[in-house]
Amino acid sequence: RLGFMKNDIEFLNAGYTKYSAPAKLNLFLKILNKRKDGYHNLQSIFHLIDLKDDIFIKIRYEDTQINIKNSSSQIKPSSDLAFKAAKLMLTNHNLGVDIYINKKIPIGSGLGGGSSNAAIVIMAINKLCKFNLSKINLIKKGLKLGADVPFFINGTNAWAEGIGEVLHSIKIPNFTYVVMYPDLSIDTKAIFNDFKLTNSLIPLKISTSYKADEHDFIKNDLEEQVFKNI
């Protein structure tokens, strides 16, 4: 079993490598239409913020076990995206991995914590095991786990389209955001499933920058549905 360590030094002394998995904000969210596969086409601006989970990873060369511990009791190992990411990367390789995640991004907050964890695990295993997969191939693997994972693998602020996997770099001024967490957990998938589109909407023009005065017009199409589900 994977044990708990008291601090970063103990992890590092035990042979782990530390990684940071950042959260993201959706500066707006426009739902365009629902696809035949059940996903929704959308437009958004994904903005990385400095709220981060700490992830400690150590490759197991002696067996193929995938062991994962999460500081949040809300997440079962078998349903953890980080576990699924490790399994995806190590299938057909005679290797295992120990992963410990110190959660700082609130669960069910819409900040992309699970997707970010999965992205970091994918990139870390690629580096530690010297698989030398390209970023494009890593993004393709990440998309199998969730629509937001490619964004975190890409690692830069982006104008997002498709189901969130079509990314265009965007320049954003150095804004300060106050992120308030009301101690509520919302299932993003359930919110999308419950969302009722009244009609297909016309897409916005792709932007390469985001200005301060545009904050007055930002809107989240899922906001009303979220409050209905609280």
Question: Could you describe each region identified by the protein language model?
Answer:
Residues 4-109, 127-136, 172, 181-182:
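ATP-binding N-lobe of GHMP and related small-molecule kinases
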Residues 34, 104-110, 142, 151, ...:
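Short glycine- and Lys/Arg-enriched binding-loop motifs that mark or flank ligand-binding interfaces
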Residues 61-76, 121, 143, 211-221:
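Short, basic/glycine-rich phosphate-binding loops at helix/coil junctions
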Residues 66, 152-154, 159-230:
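Conserved, helical-rich catalytic subdomain that frames metal- and/or nucleotide-binding sites
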Residues 109-135, 139, 151:
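DPxDG-like acidic metal-binding loop motif
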Residues 137, 141, 201-203:
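Glycine/GP-enriched mid-protein hinge/lid loop-to-helix segment characteristic of carbohydrate kinases
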